[in-house]
């Protein structure tokens, strides 16, 4: 089952989520929106197993990265009709 990985613009570019992911789903890409000049990206979401280690590793109080498991994806992201 595929899971959606959403990275919010509150990301501080710390790389904690990238290092926590056991399947290398995430990577850092250039971004001018924070001091670190980088943001997490999820180019390989098809490999995500939904362990949410990236969420646990995120040091921001508002979880800059979220994993939405299967059916909760559209509902949680506000895409359901």
Curated annotation (Swiss-Prot):
EC numbers: 1.97.1.12
Residues binding [4Fe-4S] cluster 2: 21, 48, 51, 54
UniProt enzyme class: oxidoreductase
A single cellular component GO annotation: plasma membrane-derived thylakoid membrane
A molecular function (GO) term: oxidoreductase activity
UniProt cofactor(s): [4Fe-4S] cluster
SUPFAM superfamilies: 4Fe-4S ferredoxins (SSF54862)
NCBIfam families according to UniProt: PS_I_psaC
Its job: Apoprotein for the two 4Fe-4S centers FA and FB of photosystem I (PSI); essential for photochemical activity. FB is the terminal electron acceptor of PSI, donating electrons to ferredoxin. The C-terminus interacts with PsaA/B/D and helps assemble the protein into the PSI complex. Required for binding of PsaD and PsaE to PSI. PSI is a plastocyanin/cytochrome c6-ferredoxin oxidoreductase, converting photonic excitation into a charge separation, which transfers an electron from the donor P700 chlorophyll pair to the spectroscopically characterized acceptors A0, A1, FX, FA and FB in turn.
Protein name stated in the entry: Photosystem I iron-sulfur center
């Amino acid at each position: 089952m595929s899971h959606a990985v959403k990275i919010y613009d509150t990301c501080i570019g710390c790389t904690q989520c990238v290092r926590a992911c056991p399947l290398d789903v995430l990577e850092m890409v250039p971004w001018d929106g924070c001091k670190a000049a980088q943001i997490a990206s999820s180019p390989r979401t098809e490999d995500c197993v939904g362990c949410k280690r990236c969420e646990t590793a995120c040091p921001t109080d508002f979880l800059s990265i979220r994993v939405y498991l299967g059916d909760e994806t559209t509902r949680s992201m506000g895409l359901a009709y």
